[in-house]
Curated annotation (Swiss-Prot):
Its cofactor is Mg(2+). Keywords: ATP-binding, Coenzyme A biosynthesis, Cytoplasm, Magnesium, Nucleotide-binding, Nucleotidyltransferase, Transferase. GO terms for cellular component: cytoplasm. The record marks 19 as: Transition state stabilizer. The keyword ATP-binding applies. GO terms for biological process: coenzyme A biosynthetic process. One of its GO terms (molecular function) is ATP binding. Homohexamer. This is Phosphopantetheine adenylyltransferase.
Length: 163
């Protein structure tokens, strides 16, 4: 039987409970999942790549079939081919996400026609949540309780101690 291997990518700057919900749901659908932290060349990162990896790795520690990987200046589809991924995993919060993902899937299919894309619709409670909104809350030192994993809260508290 073919092993189903998924790749869920994002900048995870920082990881949110919405991201974790997608991973949790996907972990039951796939034999193995890679969660790929990618630097988005169109965005300036708030957290350094190694910090994002540490926060995400800690948040996903209980998942036995999930491996966190990082990539710098590479297309996710190229990493997917290298890892022998069978499916890309994408989360959809709203119609704007769908339009973006529809375009992305077109090009991914051109580059790797054998890799399918699976879309998981965000649960209602996470549809308004985004990393950019969390960064805004961090800037104004607002509570992150219930929005992000404890690893992110601990990192923010550590950063606040230094300032």
């Amino acid at each position: 039987m073919l092993t189903k291997i998924g790749l869920y990518t994002g900048s995870f700057d920082p990881v949110t409970n919405g991201h974790l919900d997608i991973v949790k749901r996907a972990s039951g659908l796939f034999d193995q999942i890679y969660v790929g932290i990618f630097d988005n060349p169109t965005k300036k990162s708030y957290f350094k790549l190694e910090v994002r990896k540490a926060m995400l790795t800690q948040a996903l520690a209980d998942f036995t079939n999930v491996i966190v990987v990082t990539s710098h200046e590479r297309l996710a589809i190229d990493v997917a081919k290298e890892l022998r991924v069978t499916h890309l995993i994408r989360g959809l919060r709203n119609a704007t996400d769908f339009e973006y993902e529809e375009n992305l899937e077109y090009f991914n299919h051109l580059l790797a026609p054998n890799i399918e894309t699976v879309y998981l619709i965000s649960r209602n409670k996470w549809q308004a949540l985004s990393s950019s909104r969390v960064r805004e809350l961090i800037h104004f030192q607002s509570s992150l309780e219930g929005l992000v994993p404890q690893s992110v809260i601990a990192q923010v508290e550590k950063m606040n101690e230094k300032t």
